[in-house]
Amino acid sequence: HLRNHSGWKPFRCDKCDYQCVNKSMLNSHLKSHSNIYQYRCADCTYATKYCHSLKL
C-alpha cells in the first residue's frame, strides 16, 4: 500500500512507458498490447480484452 504514496513504480511495461505499483496492474495493462479478445458477448459477435467491458 505504501508504494501508492511514495510514487515508486517498480513494474514497467517493456512495450511502452507505462509504470505501476503492482504486478496485477501490469498484467492488466499488457492486454492492451495483445490481439487476444477472450471475452465474448453471448448475444452478438462483440469481443473484448477486458471482462468489465461486458458488464451492464
Curated annotation (Swiss-Prot):
Q: What UniProt keywords are attached to this protein's entry?
A: Developmental protein, DNA-binding, Gap protein, Metal-binding, Nucleus, Repeat, Zinc, Zinc-finger
Spell out the subcellular localization from the entry. Answer: Nucleus
Any one of the GO BP annotations: segmentation
Matching InterPro entries: Znf_C2H2_sf, Znf_C2H2_type
Query: From the UniProt record, which GO molecular function terms apply?
Result: DNA binding; zinc ion binding
KW tRNA-binding (keyword) present: no
Q: Name one GO cellular component term.
A: nucleus
Domain of life assignment:
Eukaryota
Q: What is the annotated role of this protein in its UniProt record?
A: Gap class segmentation protein that controls development of head structures.
Q: Which family does it belong to?
A: Belongs to the hunchback C2H2-type zinc-finger protein family.
Report the protein name in the record: Protein hunchback
Q: Which organism is it from?
A: Locusta migratoria (Migratory locust)
